[in-house]
UniProtKB/Swiss-Prot annotation:
Binding site for ATP: G38, P39, N40, G41, A42, G43, K44, T45
Pfam families: ABC_tran
Localization annotation: Cell inner membrane
Species in which this protein is naturally found: Cupriavidus metallidurans (strain ATCC 43123 / DSM 2839 / NBRC 102507 / CH34)
Name recorded for this polypeptide: Cytochrome c biogenesis ATP-binding export protein CcmA 2
Gene3D superfamilies, alphabetized: P-loop containing nucleotide triphosphate hydrolases
Subunit-structure text: The complex is composed of two ATP-binding proteins (CcmA) and two transmembrane proteins (CcmB).
Record-level Gene Ontology MF annotations: ABC-type heme transporter activity; ATP binding; ATP hydrolysis activity
GO biological process: cytochrome complex assembly
Gene: ccmA2
Length: 211
């Protein structure tokens, strides 16, 4: 068994004065997928934000390759691709320009061929030059997911990635995720819908400690 790369020990998250969960442990090695499930309010999004280091836990510690991670840790963030409920695309930029901007923000030289290929995989080649504000919610989600193929990050943290996707785009996402895991990447996916990929399932309603 490969050594753990991402570890969470005795994690606890609070909302105001109320504990959402506590005592949570996670240990993930290269190629691992963790599906996080649970009803609304169970803390799925909060857990992803803690794992992204965007929010400190109320309790416990997070480790990456054996080193403690603190909120906003730049070295850790360079390994993370985080996709939340909000797609994070700019409405006045085209789909293609959004990918260009994301590449530059990641410190990469934009590769036009790779960007066109990423958009085409999600069926966006015909709207690549259209302003994002003219796209449907499903198309905007697909633009956001296209970024994952362009910025190689070891850890994917995805919050309901299948939202607004049609069947073809859902299949494309499953393929993209499988490729990431086969390369030794790690993924933590909050979802209401079980993914077909092999991996552990964490149900925050039953598997995480509560007050």
């Amino acid at each position: 068994m490969a050594d753990a790369v991402l570890e969470a020990r005795e994690l606890g998250v609070r909302r105001g004065h109320c504990a959402i969960f506590r005592g949570l442990g996670i240990s993930l090695a290269p190629g691992d997928l963790l599906q996080v499930m649970g009803p609304n309010g169970a803390g799925k999004t909060s857990l992803l934000r803690v794992l992204s280091s965007l929010m400190p836990p109320a309790e416990g510690d997070l480790y990456w390759r054996g080193r403690a991670v603190r909120a906003g840790d730049p070295d850790y963030l360079a390994q993370v691709a985080y996709l939340g409920h909000v797609n994070g695309i700019y409405p006045d930029l085209s789909a293609f320009e959004n990918l260009q901007f994301a590449a530059r923000m990641a410190g990469q030289q934009p590769d036009a061929d790779a960007m066109h290929h990423a958009l085409a995989r999600f069926g966006l080649d015909r709207v690549a030059d259209a302003p994002a504000r003219t796209l449907s919610q499903g198309q905007r989600r697909r633009v956001a997911l296209s970024r994952l193929a362009l910025t190689p990050r070891a850890l994917w943290l995805l919050d309901e990635p299948l939202t607004s996707l049609d069947d073809a785009s859902t299949d494309c996402f499953h393929t993209l995720l499988a490729e990431h895991l086969q390369r030794g990447g790690i993924a933590v996916v909050a979802t209401h819908q079980r993914l077909p990929a092999e991996g552990a399932v964490l149900d925050l309603a039953t598997d995480a400690g509560s007050p």
